[in-house]
Amino acid sequence: VCSSDLILVVFDNHTYEVAGKRAVELLKENGFNVKELLFDTGDDILIPDEKTLGRIVQEQDLDTSLMVAVGSGVINDSVKFVTSRSGLPYIIVATAPSMDGYVADGAPIFSQGYKYSPVAHLTYGLVGDTDILKTAPQDLIQAGYGDVVGKITAIADWDLAVKANNDYRCDTCVTLVNRALDKCFAKAEGLKDRDPESLGALLEALTLTGVAMALVNISRPASGAE
């Protein structure tokens, strides 16, 4: 992407204040051509449905070379889905360490009232600034930590699936996930105080489990009976 290319930055009214405004400023300061897409939902929750996805497609000009998603689950999944279909790369600016889907190869969306998770491409880059993450609501931080705790049973379930169903098991992915979990658990005490190192370790664990899922093209490294 060069400075003459168009970058579409996508955010809602909440993530704009947290990180979107600064992201746009930084891009413009560095000479990039930027277009902004704001989902002004008020106090309502943005849904990754046909209306949301269609709006992103509508705002994607023909000379758009990159999208930047500023948010967490819904914003990331929506931009991931659209760019995977249009062939554009995208970058996610994480605003909360709340889930493991930032770099996973699925994009949960709603279609005709039903939720499903079509395959989508991976993000070109993930920005996880702890100065941004520490502003996330505590319940989202707790959700992310709960997601990490669930990986313990996910790995155990994977072992069981190998024995019971002769499933494929990737030792590299298991090692990757376990190391990330150990680091996160060692620093978990600091999450209640929004300690930057603890938040960084949490996002790293969530990110690496997403990477593990993408590597084996199944959810076993990160999801099981939990």
PLM features: residue spans?
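N-terminal small/polar loop signature for handling phosphorylated ligands or for N-terminal nucleophile
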Residues: L8, N13-I91, G190-A201
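Alpha-helix capping and helix-loop boundary segments enriched in small/acidic/polar residues
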Residues: D40-I47, Y114-K115, A136, R220
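Solvent-exposed alpha-helices and their adjacent loops that cap or buttress functional pockets
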Residues: E59-L62, T83, Y116-H121, G125, ...
